């Protein structure tokens, strides 16, 4: 290969071997380096003629006085400070925010309400969250005699304390009591056959039970989350949390900053309260919210608000299908996008179909993604569905989602499997009690009242999404192992798009419209070892 060959002394090679995965290839990874050093190193890399190994030696591994290099027990304390000074200079003085993406950290957040978890997971770019699942883990445990739900300090010092605690306990009591009842009911309804492994049957049955009763869990229910994020992600998230109206989220912002300052201080220092960037950001967020909230409250409507669960296409592009076809052709053409769109508009219908079909004909499963040209069209949807389904769909990040406050105003989703069974009465009693308590609290504490709302209650939110991201979401979330509620939303999204223009159906060939009883059974059976 042509390129500048780097030559290192034996001692330099010995030193470098502790910090890079190889000494000769053009492709190598870094190891055993602090995050701030790795980030500063890559940032300097973009403005240097040196290779990364030589730059690492020059900037961080060589003694500035005599040029000697490190040994295996090298102490990075000086280099960490040097890198930190570099970050302060670049971030603060030049505002080059992208260098904050060159290092990151893992952060665990435990005993967080599922209401707060959604705010944390709203942060889309640069971070990856994982959350304890309400579909596979029972939430009936007690610690020191108390169920695991968040006790908001404002509610705990208000006149609603006893009402809130009593209703949450009632919801958890109902949830716990229904577990064995629903399990026994499903064991009779879906008996295990001789060919089904016991462990696969037990896992799929448990998922079915939890799918039915998770709607009883209030938004105050405690969960655990794990995040990996780059420095820019953490800084933006902390800014958001520190300015939130809920005390829980402000506390999480402060505690996250404290812990991240121990591992990636240079990446998050601008979120410290005394920093001028932080003060300006807080003022901006506060003013923005106050202005938009005031304008929204002035809006009046003559029609009654619909509270029926629905998926509604609000807007789409009538010329979108031509833009998609042009987008498919563009990488293989030398003409402008405008020329190609005009070309596709004027061609015979069968020729347009041929272009569209050629982009999907080779797809053998949902992981075979369509070309990026499918991103040339976007849709907007208004969705009203249960909070549990929202929690599952909200984790998709290649789209725009906004939600309204969680409330009991739009009714709740009752699991159809429990209709006309002995369990229906206790489930509905719990829902009604939660509704009554919410209506009392919301008059004085509209945001804190959300903690009271069970997951079965409906919430309104919108999707603004390109067709390629929609393809991924709908083909994934319609699979048999998914929860029936979000499967219904996924198929509803596709139906709305196909109604808008039937030609889009080509791109959703792996959407599963089937009704499945024990949805996870086939997947669990695939996990069983063959004999």
Swiss-Prot record:
Reply yes or no: does the keyword Cytoplasm apply. Answer: no
Instruction: Output the InterPro entries linked to this UniProt entry.
Output: Thymidylate_synthase_ThyX, Thymidylate_synthase_ThyX_sf
Keywords in alphabetical order, please: Repeat
Protein's name in the database:
UPF0159 protein CPn_0746/CP_1126/CPj0746/CpB0774
What SUPFAM superfamilies does the record tag this protein with?
Thymidylate synthase-complementing protein Thy1 (SSF69796)
The similarity annotation says: Belongs to the UPF0159 family.
ThyX domain sequence ranges:
38-274, 309-511
Q: Which GO terms describe its molecular function?
A: flavin adenine dinucleotide binding; NADPH binding; thymidylate synthase (FAD) activity; thymidylate synthase activity
Which GO BP terms sit in this record? dTMP biosynthetic process
């Amino acid at each position: 290969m042509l390129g500048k060959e780097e030559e290192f002394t034996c001692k330099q090679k010995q030193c470098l071997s502790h910090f890079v995965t190889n000494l000769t290839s053009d492709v190598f990874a870094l190891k055993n380096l602090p995050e701030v050093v790795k980030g500063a190193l890559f940032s300097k890399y973009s403005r240097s003629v040196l290779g990364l190994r030589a730059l690492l030696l020059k900037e961080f591994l060589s003694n500035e006085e005599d040029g000697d290099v490190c040994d295996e027990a090298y102490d990075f304390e000086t280099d960490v400070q040097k890198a930190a000074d570099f970050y302060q200079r670049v971030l603060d003085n030049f505002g080059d925010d992208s260098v904050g993406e060159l290092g990151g950290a893992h952060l665990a957040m435990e005993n967080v309400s599922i209401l707060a978890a959604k705010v944390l997971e709203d942060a889309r770019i640069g971070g990856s969250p994982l959350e304890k699942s309400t579909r596979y883990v029972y939430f009936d445990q007690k610690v020191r005699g108390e169920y695991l739900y968040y006790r908001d300090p404002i509610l705990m010092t208000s006149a609603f304390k006893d009402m809130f605690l009593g209703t949450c306990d009632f919801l958890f009591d109902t949830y716990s009591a229904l577990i064995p009842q629903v399990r026994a009911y499903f064991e009779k309804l879906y008996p295990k056959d001789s060919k089904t492994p016991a462990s696969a049957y037990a896992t799929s049955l448990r998922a079915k039970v939890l799918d039915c009763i998770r709607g009883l869990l209030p938004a105050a229910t405690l969960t655990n989350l794990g995040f990996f994020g780059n420095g820019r992600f953490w800084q933006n998230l902390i800014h958001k949390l520190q300015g939130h109206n809920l005390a829980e989220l402000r506390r999480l912002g402060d505690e996250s900053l404290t812990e991240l300052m121990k591992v990636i201080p240079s990446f998050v220092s601008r979120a410290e309260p005394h920093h001028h960037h932080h003060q300006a950001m807080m003022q901006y967020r506060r003013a923005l919210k106050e202005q938009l909230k005031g304008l929204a409250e002035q809006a009046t409507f003559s029609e009654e608000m619909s509270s029926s669960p629905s998926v509604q296409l609000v807007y789409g592009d009538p010329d979108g299908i031509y833009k998609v076809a042009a987008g498919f052709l563009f990488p293989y053409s030398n003409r402008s996008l405008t020329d190609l769109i005009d070309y596709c508009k004027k061609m015979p219908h069968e020729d347009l179909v041929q272009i569209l079909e050629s982009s999907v004909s080779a797809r053998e499963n949902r992981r075979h993604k369509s070309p990026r040209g499918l991103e040339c069209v976007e849709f907007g949807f208004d969705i009203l569905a249960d909070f549990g389904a929202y929690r599952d769909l909200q984790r998709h990040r290649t789209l725009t989602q906004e939600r309204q406050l969680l409330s009991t105003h739009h009714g709740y989703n009752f699991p159809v499997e429990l209709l006309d069974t002995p369990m229906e009465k206790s489930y509905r009693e719990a829902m009604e009690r939660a509704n009554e308590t919410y209506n009392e609290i919301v008059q004085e504490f509209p945001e804190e009242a959300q903690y009271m709302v069970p997951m079965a209650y409906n919430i309104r939110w919108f999707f603004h999404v390109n067709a390629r991201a929609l393809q991924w979401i709908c083909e994934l979330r319609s699979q048999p192992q998914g929860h029936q509620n979000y499967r219904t939303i996924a198929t509803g999204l596709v139906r709305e798009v196909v109604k808008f223009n039937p030609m889009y159906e080509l791109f959703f060939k792996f959407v599963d419209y089937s009704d499945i009883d024990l949805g996870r059974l086939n997947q669990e059976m695939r996990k069983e070892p063959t004999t």
